[in-house]
From Swiss-Prot:
Topological relation to the membrane, as annotated: Multi-pass membrane protein
Gene name of this polypeptide: NAT2
Protein name according to UniProt: Nucleobase-ascorbate transporter 2
PANTHER family: XANTHINE-URACIL / VITAMIN C PERMEASE FAMILY MEMBER (PTHR11119)
Keywords, sorted A to Z: Membrane, Transmembrane, Transmembrane helix, Transport
Organism: Arabidopsis thaliana
Length: 524
């Protein structure tokens, strides 16, 4: 047997992912683009419905209030997605709600000045205004860091080895929203997971008139089948005598969104009244803004990879963070009960469909805005059981995590230093947030429990985020352990040309602003 030569089994690093049908600036035919945009819209509904469904009842709101918040959040998702794809990073990213904001928001909900209000509707409005005020003030963090280019300066300390744990945990860190939620209704969650894998992977070469229809629309095909199956189970009375929580997770008629939704409703700023401002609430909310900044930074790099673009230069990253801050400000003004962050599941769908086109995401933003104003039609799609979304998350979150691991190709993984940094960062990025979650479940408060509530919320929010913990550990270790002698091992030569906008000719192709706006905002 002949010896295998190393060059025959090695895989040279590639700064652009190969194998996509359409990259960031190539567009499918209009019909296909519209259908793919609708698929991204359907996927974005999961977060848009789940966050208000958790928070609104805690605030004293009814089903009508929940529908208005869902519509408002969906409307702002569309607006912020358009802003990001036009003027921000210009990557094909959906900007959705962020779970990072739930800790400070729940703290505001339990504020003694609000819980003493007896009238549920008045308590809901008062709490909403307090949340709005905190989000409006906290949004200034990302606006300042982004548009002042301070985040560009910070991101120059990020090497491939330092970003691997951050991007990987952008996906892996969401494991509790995957199969643990599928397990709440296995009879519809497991079939959805299996069908989605079969359609997107095993049947991806099935073509109709030379078009890979199953691969492109695996999500919609599987969703239609399982949603119809879930409706049959509901109509047949399969859940009639099951516990209430099981019915919430499995039935297709439990959300009350359709009956509570108006036919037409256009969200507008300050629709809940004038926001109220509290320094403690605002400071705690700033932690959530910092977390969404880190999570979005990792997600932007993953999106660039799955859109077959080059790594975004620091200037572009900072610009995107600035516009995300504008989006958080709009969320506060409109009252969405959430800030903004890049939707990780929609990034995963770029890889699943092999379509990284910017136009597709802009079309999906149009669907979000349109259906948020047509309440009944939007509520129809929003009534899909969340278990179905969780099944898809199991695949898409894992795909995004693997994109993070793919950055190891630029580094020397025969280096004990690099093995130490990656391993410790990944482990602590999973272990520390899990400790904070377990502690909170048992003690009903986080490990940080002092007399200063804002300080508790700040620390608990920071350390509940896996990408945040991973970034602190990985970037610190990477920039303090033999950093001068190991530039090549860290992968810095590969990213050197992407540190400035003009360092690579492809940057101009992928990241130049439209309408010749680069004249007024020259890249650094």
């Amino acid at each position: 047997m002949d010896l295998v030569k190393p060059e025959e089994i090695s895989h040279p690093p590639m700064d652009q992912l190969q194998g996509l049908e359409y990259c960031i600036d190539s567009n499918p035919p209009w019909g296909e683009a519209i259908a793919l945009g609708f698929e991204h819209y359907i996927l974005a509904l999961g977060t848009a419905v789940m966050i208000p469904s958790i928070l609104v009842p805690m605030m004293g709101g009814d089903d009508g209030d929940k529908v208005r918040v869902v519509q408002t959040l969906l409307f702002l998702q569309g607006v912020n997605t358009l802003l990001q794809t036009l003027f921000g990073t210009r990557l094909p990213t959906v900007i959705g709600g962020s779970y990072a904001f739930m800790v400070p928001i729940i703290s505001i909900i339990h504020d003694s000045s609000l819980t003493r209000i007896e009238d549920p509707q008045l308590r809901f409005l008062s709490t909403m205004r307090a949340v709005q005020g905190a989000i409006i003030v906290a949004s200034s963090v990302q606006i300042i860091l982004g548009f002042s280019q301070m985040w560009a300066i910070c991101s120059r300390f990020f090497s491939p080895i330092g970003m691997v744990p951050v991007i990987a945990l952008t996906g892996f860190g969401l494991f509790n929203r995957g199969f643990p939620v599928v397990g709440n209704c296995v009879e519809i969650g497991l079939p959805m997971l299996i069908l989605f894998v079969i359609f997107s992977q095993y049947l991806k070469n099935f073509q109709f008139r030379q078009f890979p229809v199953v691969e492109r629309f695996a999500l919609i095909i599987a969703l239609i089948i399982v949603w119809a199956y879930a409706h049959v189970l509901t109509a047949s009375g399969a859940y009639k005598h099951r516990p209430h929580q099981t019915q919430l997770n499995c039935r297709t008629d439990m959300s009350n969104l359709i009956s509570s939704a108006p036919w037409i409703k256009i969200p507008y700023p300050l629709q809940w009244g004038a926001p109220s401002f509290d320094a403690g609430h605002a400071f705690a909310m700033m932690a959530a803004v910092l977390v969404s900044l880190i999570e979005s930074t990792g997600a932007f790099k993953a999106a660039a990879r799955l859109a077959s673009a080059t790594p975004p230069p620091p200037h572009v990253l900072s610009r995107g963070i600035g516009w995300q801050g504008i989006g958080i400000l709009l969320n506060g003004l409109f009252g969405t009960l959430s800030g903004s962050s890049v939707s990780v599941e929609n990034i995963g769908l770029l890889g699943s469909t092999r379509v990284g086109s910017r136009r597709v995401i802009q079309i999906s933003a149009g669907f979000m805005i349109f259906f948020s104003m047509l309440g009944k039609f939007g509520a129809l799609f929003a009534s899909i059981p969340f278990t179905i979304f969780a099944a898809v998350y199991c695949v898409l979150f894992g795909l995004v995590a693997s994109v993070g691991l793919s950055f190891l190709q630029f580094t020397n993984m025969n280096s004990l230093r690099n093995l130490f940094i990656v391993g410790v960062s990944l482990f602590l990025g999973l272990s520390i947030p899990e400790y904070f979650r377990d502690f909170s479940m048992k003690a009903l408060h986080g490990p940080a429990h002092t007399n200063a509530g804002w300080f508790n919320d700040f620390l608990n929010t920071i350390f509940l985020s896996s990408p945040m913990v991973a970034l602190m550990v990985a970037v610190f270790l990477d920039n303090t352990l033999d950093y001068k002698e190991t530039a090549r091992d860290r992968g810095l030569p590969w990213w050197a040309k992407f540190r400035t906008f003009k360092g690579d000719s492809r940057n101009e192709e992928f990241y130049t602003l439209p309408f010749n706006l680069n004249r007024f905002f020259p890249p650094s």
